[in-house]
Amino acid sequence: MSLLMISENVKLAREYALLGNYDSAMVYYQGVLDQMNKYLYSVKDTFLQQKWQQVWQEINMECKHVKDIMSTLEGFKLDSSPVKTTQHEFPSHDGEVWSLPVPVERRPSPGPRKRQSVQCNDNKSHNNRFSAAAKGPNLPSARNANNVKMKPVRAREKKDALIKNKSSADVSETEVKRFDGSGYDKDLIEALERDIISQNPNIRWDDIADLEEAKKLLKEAVVLPMWMPEFFKGIRRPWKGVLMVGPPGTGKTLLAKAVATECKTTFFNISSSTLTSKYRGESEKLVRLLFEMARFYAPTTIFIDEIDSICSRRGTSEEHEASRRVKAELLVQMDGVGGASENEDPSKMVMVLAATNFPWDIDEALRRRLEKRIYIPLPSAKGREELLRINLKELELADDVNIECIAENMDGYSGADITNVCRDASLMAMRRRIEGLTPEEIRNLSRDDMHMPTTMEDFEMALKKVSKSVSASDIEKYEKWIFEFG
């Protein structure tokens, strides 16, 4: 889409509005708003996208001003209806003045009636009574003439009303659509709408070290179907469910945040507390309502963190009846007769993105519906080095800091463990500086005194204090499960 075309349409809309041709101006304004909406989907830079959204708001405000002017003009047309007069309009009776003779019922010729009207206009005060008497028998024909004149006015009013309704419908299409939750409790809808991430989490793919396979799969499942909808059809339809499996602190939630930032889809962040209610039957309603809202706001990604807490194995002795009903409704909505069908339009897809640290506790039916299962392992040597550079990019490092050596000493550390090491090392210099000082002296320290470079010794001390959180036996369990079910 050409930016020149958008600029020309804005120029034409404003020119028509200045010339008073508001109908044509509204048509161009609506076209510009639709073009800008389509262009926003192709803008990847967040800063540019915010700028375009501001421009869209300004154009939309101009469109509303034109619409208000049209409404005001419409009100003037409705108020200008002719005042009905009575057939015989006689002056009030005066006892000293003879009353006027009754007018003769005859059709006057056009000439004298014209002269009489001219005379009435010139001598209003003198001939007021005579003009009223003379006009009396001609009122029916005058009323017919008014009716003839009103016909095109009413037709024009109907046409303007149709144009106004059409323009208001076009404006409503450009506004943010709202879910119609008739049949559901308003509180349930508001609870789920709070879980829609409308603000930008500001996590990019580049902010996540390593995990190239997981990034590639998520792009294939969410981004590519929106770019190539004609390709992802039939057997090549997008994945409806993706399960991320791995030890704690390996970046599963960060990947979900990157999906919310990069993929430009509606993103529901769901936890077990969202789908839990103390009232009988409301948890199942929440699950059903969640998927109905997801289909309404499609394309949608539903992220369920720690899904094992919601959908653990059925049939165990610890399972409650309410929990079983919630699981059944979730399974039906994901892939049942009335659930998520194979939509022909991949741009209207609903994908479930789940994460868990205990994949062996997940129900077998849910495991089947989460079609793609990917393993998020501990970072490799290259990944650890990249993660160190990401965490330390805002710190001032001493010349003796060797990031490659630090990465080698962190074998077996998860991404969260590496972040904790970097945080602890960055505080070492501050701890040395304030050691032995009173609170008053600490408050009087300058900013330059606090910002001292982090040394290699600080990292060595941090490595001694922060241990790895994942054992070798846990890694074996994850690898065994992904080998069997991945």
Curated annotation (Swiss-Prot):
Residues 86-96 have a biased composition (Basic and acidic residues). Residues 84-145 are annotated as: Disordered. It catalyses: n ATP + n H2O + a microtubule = n ADP + n phosphate + (n+1) alpha/beta tubulin heterodimers. InterPro entries: AAA+_ATPase, AAA_lid_3, ATPase_AAA_core, ATPase_AAA_CS, KATNA1, KATNA1_MIT, KTNA1_AAA_dom, MT-severing_AAA_ATPase. CDD domains: Kp60-NTD (cd21748), RecA-like_KTNA1 (cd19522). Its EC number is 5.6.1.1. Its main location: cytoplasm. It holds the Pfam family KATNA1_MIT. Disulfide bonds: none annotated. One of its GO terms (biological process) is cell division. It comes from the Eukaryota. The keyword ATP-binding applies. GO terms for cellular component: centrosome; cytoplasm; microtubule; microtubule cytoskeleton; midbody; mitotic spindle pole; spindle; spindle pole. ATPase activity is stimulated by microtubules, which promote homooligomerization. ATP-dependent microtubule severing is stimulated by interaction with katnb1. ATP binds at G246, P247, P248, G249, T250, G251, K252, T253. GO terms for molecular function: ATP binding; ATP hydrolysis activity; microtubule binding; microtubule severing ATPase activity. HAMAP family: Katanin_p60_A1 (MF_03023). Catalytic subunit of a complex which severs microtubules in an ATP-dependent manner. Microtubule severing may promote rapid reorganization of cellular microtubule arrays and the release of microtubules from the centrosome following nucleation. In mitotic spindles this could allow depolymerization of the microtubule end proximal to the centrosome, and subsequent poleward microtubule flux. Belongs to the AAA ATPase family. Katanin p60 subunit A1 subfamily. This is Katanin p60 ATPase-containing subunit A1. It comes from Xenopus laevis.
